[in-house]
């Protein structure tokens, strides 16, 4: 069996991937404030296949609680409208020619708390992903040390670097959560 290689850069990249994934997931949560990323999960039936909203229209934010969607192809307006209505966002599109407007309703306290719970769930998934990457890195180091490829001192030093990368990623995840929580709870 080939000896596994230890690459701290790869471990950091994988941890950063978990943070990026969390940011994307949290970006799609409704906060009562209009953001183009709110429509990222919506798929539109276009030209015989399912496409992301960004590939059929431009989404802008003319007001804090209003999204404006400029559909590029006039024939796609009804499909975009249908995709928005069928999404679980609970938004009601208003169409004016090739432009669709979405007013983002105020969220009540109960809905805000539900969104915070969902944000915590996404955050815990990201923390678990980071911990899995840490475990993989530490397992490789232990195997290398056991096989005599690195000294015990090197194993301990590199394990400390893996732990530092883990702590940095977890702190970044906590920061992303705190920011999103503040945004959700803001009235």
Swiss-Prot record:
Organism classification: Bacteria, Pseudomonadati, Pseudomonadota, Alphaproteobacteria, Hyphomicrobiales
Protein name per the record: Ribosome-recycling factor
Gene, per the UniProt record: frr
Family: Belongs to the RRF family.
Cytoplasm listed as a keyword: yes
GO annotation, biological process: cytoplasmic translational termination
InterPro entries in UniProt: Ribosome_recyc_fac, Ribosome_recyc_fac_dom, RRF_sf
Keywords linked to the UniProt accession: Cytoplasm, Protein biosynthesis
GO CC field: cytosol
Location of the protein in the cell: Cytoplasm
One Pfam family linked to the record: RRF
Function: Responsible for the release of ribosomes from messenger RNA at the termination of protein biosynthesis. May increase the efficiency of translation by recycling ribosomes from one round of translation to another.
MF-aspect GO terms: ribosomal large subunit binding
């Amino acid at each position: 069996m080939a000896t596994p290689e230890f690459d701290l850069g790869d471990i950091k990249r994988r941890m950063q991937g978990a943070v990026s994934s969390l940011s994307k997931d949290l970006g799609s949560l409704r906060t009562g404030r209009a953001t183009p990323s709110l429509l990222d999960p919506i798929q539109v039936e276009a030209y015989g296949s399912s496409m992301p909203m960004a590939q059929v229209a431009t989404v802008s934010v003319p007001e804090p609680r209003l999204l404006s969607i400029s559909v590029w192809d006039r024939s796609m307006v009804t499909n975009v409208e249908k995709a928005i209505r069928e999404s679980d966002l609970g938004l009601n599109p208003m169409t004016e020619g090739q432009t669709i407007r979405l007013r983002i309703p105020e969220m009540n306290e109960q809905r805000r708390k539900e969104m915070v719970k969902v944000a915590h769930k996404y955050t815990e998934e990201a923390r678990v992903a980071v911990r899995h990457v840490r475990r993989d890195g530490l397992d490789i180091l232990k195997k290398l040390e056991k096989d005599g490829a690195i000294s015990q001192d090197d194993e301990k030093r590199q394990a400390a670097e893996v732990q530092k990368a883990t702590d940095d990623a977890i702190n970044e995840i906590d920061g992303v959560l705190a920011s999103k929580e503040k945004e959700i709870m803001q009235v």
